[in-house]
Amino acid sequence: RDSRNIPILSLDSMAVYRGLDILSAKPTDVMQAQVKYLGIDIAEPDQNFSVVDYLNYLLDIDFPKMTYDMDIIAVGGTGLYFSSMIKNYEFRPTDPTIRAELEQLNYGQLMKFHEIYNIELPSVELNKRRLIRNIESSLLQDSKYVFPKLNIPENNVGIFWNNPDYKLNIKKRTSDMIQNGLADELSLLNNPSKTILQAIGMNIDTDIESNINQKSYKLAKKQITWFKKEDSL
């Protein structure tokens, strides 16, 4: 415990949800009693929690003012959360009718949709969710909104730990999650949001431990690459 009791801001898109303590490796009650944690337990599991929701939460707790009054450690997590805090965040609203129609298409059909309507594919690893969002962005390109960057200091310092044993750490964390009752936690979720259903550990029927490990390895590598390219750190 640091004598200055520096608050910790979670950038984890799953830790925002109540009831996902094991899945998101949320700090224990003892840890939360010692240090103030922000960005956790702020949404119900049936809520589709977006980046805009996260930014509105930060404004609700007067986070910009806090950053001038004290040091804050941001940990994790979702690179887009961090980027949206310090830059203008551009987003397009979704159209429920368009989304419902696109969700009926499979991966191959979505790729064909891009080809037929000459929609440029995103330069990221493709999956059904990203293809749908890319089509929506193209169809709704005139409906772009900008969430202004938060008024927070620009002298941010990034700490990157090039841990050669990160895969071993992931394996241990996964094993601990399963032993601590991950399956029971997930079974108790009532009508989980689409955001949660996309999380690592969800919708896995067999060999859950191996699946979580493999997806976590990929995510960890992606996060390291993303944050090292962030020019504000």
Sequence positions of predicted segments:
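Phosphate/pyrophosphate-binding catalytic cores of soluble transferases and nucleic-acid-acting enzymes
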Residues: 1-233
